[in-house]
Every structure is written in structure tokens, then in C-alpha cells.
């Protein structure tokens, strides 16, 4: 609920390409006020030092601190459904640190009981189409095809109003190999011959699982920012990266929160 309220009364342009998310007006002055009001609520448990009116840059960053074992995957799945219901956001990329977590996330999203819960118990009239990006085995000579999961994600249409498209990717695939950076595939997607460019064109929302493994100076995070240029990054985790602020004697190390909306202590 808190994440959805960040976008309250912010201008959202729905007149976009059928394969793209609506365009959020990231210059809106409403973001700062909305975020600060959410942080002030007692139930959000956000410490005073983390309540601040930070400006929004080219990407809106939102942080949710949840201890391990408190239902993080469930919460961000709920967030996906709610953002789709309220604002028509239907393209989400979930970045995870490992192949094991990637498999676990995919299993959760595809579970029959999970689908039934969100549809029958919570009343969301939408279905998540789950794609999992896998490493491609070295191809022999012949035609080079776009990664199947990327194609399905990008080509997913907003005209299917009850469909949400999710692509799960582990961090190594964002930085190693040429699968997402090469531009010599034989077939293009929506006019794009490079997978990263095709993904960027969807104006995705990115969910980062376990943000301490995606620090700002790490290659995978840099790839998310520079190659995907998401409209919004939402980080869910028990531990967040550290960052150094100040100079000289005032230099100190603090948690690298950006717009912390919730702090759930176990």
C-alpha cells in the first residue's frame, strides 16, 4: 500500500507503445511530499534520520527493509499486483543475486495456491506471466535468436489488460557474456536488435531482491541503471549496502537507503 501511495496524484501517461509501461512523470513535485508523509507514519517504523525529502532523479528509488523470513517475496508480489491495478504498470524485472533464488522466485510465482490467493482471496483480476532469463549455451553456426524470455517479456502487450509480465534475472547474467549486449541476432524485437535496448524500451520497474548484493559500485547495479534505465527501482531486503558520506573528520559510513518506506524488524 505504501509503495502505491508514492504515485498518488502523480501524472502518468498511458498513451505509449503497446509493449511499454505507462510513463511516470518523475519530475513531479508530489513524490517528495507523498514519500515524506508515508515515512512519518508510526507503523512504517522509519527512523527519524532516514526521513528526508530527497529529490527524485532519473530513476525513482524506493526501499523496503524486511528481515529474512518475513515474507519478502509475497510482499513484492503483492506490490506488483497493486501497481498494475492502480496505475497499469505491467512490466517488472526482478533482479536476484543467485540462480537458486531465481529458481525459488519462479516457483513461488507459478504456484497454483499463490495464483489462487491473489485472485480469489485478494481479488486481483490479473495474471502474472513469468519469464526466467537463463544462460544460453554456445550456439553452433547458424541463425542467432533473441533469448526467448526477453522476447516474450518485451512483446507482452498492454492491450491484454489482465496480464502482467515479469522477467526474473540473476545478477551474473546482467554483466557476463554477450547475450544481452550483442546486436547480431537474426531477428529483431519491436525494431530492436540488442536485448538490453529492447528491455529498456519497455520502461520497466525493477525489483531488487537482497540489495546488499547490488551495491551502487557493483557491476550488476550499474548495468541496471545504464542499460535498463528503469523508471523505478524498488529494493526489498534485510540488509542494505553501506555508503560513505562527508569528508575529513566528518566522514562516516551509513546504510545506503534511498526513500526508505518501511522498516520491519524481526
Language-model-detected regions and their locations in the chain:
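ATP-dependent helicase/translocase motor core
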Residues: 1-70, 74-88, 107-111, 115-116
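Signature of the SF2 helicase/ATPase Hel1-core->accessory helical subdomain module
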Residues: 78-85, 99, 103-107, 168-266
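Extracellular/periplasmic catalytic domains that process cell-envelope and extracellular macromolecules
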Residues: 57, 159-163, 227
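Inter-Walker segment of RecA-like/P-loop motor cores
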Residues: 116-186
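Extended hydrophobic secondary-structure segments that form protein cores and membrane-embedded regions
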Residues: 61-69, 76, 92-97, 127-135, ...
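Conserved Walker A/P-loop ATP-binding site and its immediately adjacent core
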Residues: 75, 88-134, 171-173
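Surface-exposed intrinsically disordered loops and tails
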Residues: 21-54, 134-152, 183-195, 216, ...
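Short, high-confidence coil segments that cap the C-terminus of an alpha-helix
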Residues: 89, 162-164, 230
Amino acid at each position: 500500500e505504501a509503495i502505491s501511495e508514492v504515485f498518488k496524484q502523480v501524472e502518468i501517461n498511458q498513451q505509449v507503445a503497446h509493449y511499454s509501461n505507462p510513463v511516470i512523470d518523475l519530475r513531479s513535485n508530489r513524490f517528495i511530499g507523498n514519500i515524506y508523509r508515508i515515512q512519518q507514519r508510526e507503523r512504517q517504523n522509519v527512523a527519524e534520520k532516514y526521513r528526508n525529502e530527497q529529490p527524485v532523479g532519473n530513476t525513482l528509488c524506493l526501499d523496503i527493509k524486511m528481515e529474512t523470513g518475513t515474507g519478502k517475496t509475497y510482499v513484492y508480489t503483492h506490490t506488483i499486483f497493486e501497481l498494475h491495478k492502480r496505475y497499469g504498470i505491467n512490466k517488472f524485472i526482478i533482479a536476484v543475486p543467485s540462480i537458486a533464488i531465481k529458481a525459488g522466485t519462479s516457483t513461488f510465482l507459478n504456484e497454483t495456491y499463490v495464483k489462487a490467493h491473489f485472485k480469489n482471496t485478494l481479488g486481483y483480476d490479473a495474471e502474472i506471466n513469468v519469464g526466467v532469463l537463463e544462460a544460453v549455451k554456445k550456439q553452433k553456426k547458424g541463425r542467432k535468436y533473441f533469448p526467448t524470455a526477453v522476447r516474450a517479456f518485451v512483446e507482452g502487450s498492454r492491450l491484454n489488460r489482465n496480464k502482467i509480465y515479469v522477467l526474473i534475472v540473476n545478477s551474473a547474467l546482467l554483466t557476463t557474456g554477450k547475450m544481452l549486449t550483442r546486436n547480431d541476432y537474426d531477428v529483431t524485437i519491436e525494431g530492436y536488435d540488442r536485448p538490453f535496448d529492447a528491455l529498456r524500451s519497455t520502461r520497466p520497474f525493477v525489483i531488487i531482491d537482497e540489495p546488499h548484493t547490488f551495491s551502487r559500485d557493483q557491476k550488476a547495479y550499474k548495468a541496471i541503471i545504464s542499460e535498463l534505465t528503469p523508471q523505478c527501482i524498488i529494493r526489498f531486503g534485510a540488509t542494505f549496502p553501506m555508503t560513505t558520506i562527508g569528508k575529513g573528520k566528518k566522514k562516516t559510513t551509513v546504510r545506503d537507503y534511498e526513500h526508505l518506506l518501511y522498516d520491519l524488524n524481526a
